[in-house]
Amino acid sequence: IRLSLVGSEMCIRDRYEGSLWSRGILPQDTSKMLRDERGGHVEVDESSSLDWDTLRARIKQHGMRNSNCVAIAPTATISNIIGVSACIEPTFQNLYVKSNLSGEFTVVNDYLVRDLKKLGLWDEVMVADLKYFDGSLSRIDRVPSELRELYATAFEVEPSWLVECASRRQKWIDQAQSLNIYMSGASGKKLDDTYKLAWLRGLKLSLIHISEPTRLRRI
């Protein structure tokens, strides 16, 4: 809406005419276009709860200032610097040492620390356990099961759920999203299943590298 207002107050972007925006096609409409192009084989929930027709009409009348509005880029290093989670990424580990060109620094899940302190469980033994188990709570029995589930690390989250979440986001994104898929004990079948699921959900995947969880130290 804001970019449509800017387009009406200033001017629309170059080469607006002929774009998807000028034809009243919003990001969530493109899954149907992909289905028509494929002749089916796109399993995406296309339901919505807001009045998008009004926005379509406004954009067709006033245009858009930008060619794209939303893109989700990799944010791992930035999030570490400012002390927040990495946007759409699952937590890599609850405690680990990160290495990059600037050196090495320790990353701790502050939200986990807060919850463990409330339960009186944050102590030197807990820190030692997290180091020993590579930042995972799964084998620390004194941590309540609900916390172990809540703070599951990236390699403990089933990859299919990451794909499902990406699919639900993508229909509202007009550019693209960057998402890492983590696999513990990756196999040819696991990779094939993940690629096929992503394809059915209207996503694209690119394989950059595969690393085992215990060996993944450089990020």
Named regions from a protein language model:
Residues 1-7, 209-219:
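Single conserved hydrophobic/aromatic residue that forms the stacking wall/gate
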Residues 10-11, 76:
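Active-site loops and adjacent core secondary-structure elements that bind or stabilize anionic groups
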Residues 21, 25, 29, 37-49, ...:
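Catalytic alpha/beta core of large soluble enzyme barrels
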Residues 12-14, 209-210:
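Short amphipathic alpha-helical motifs in flexible or low-confidence regions
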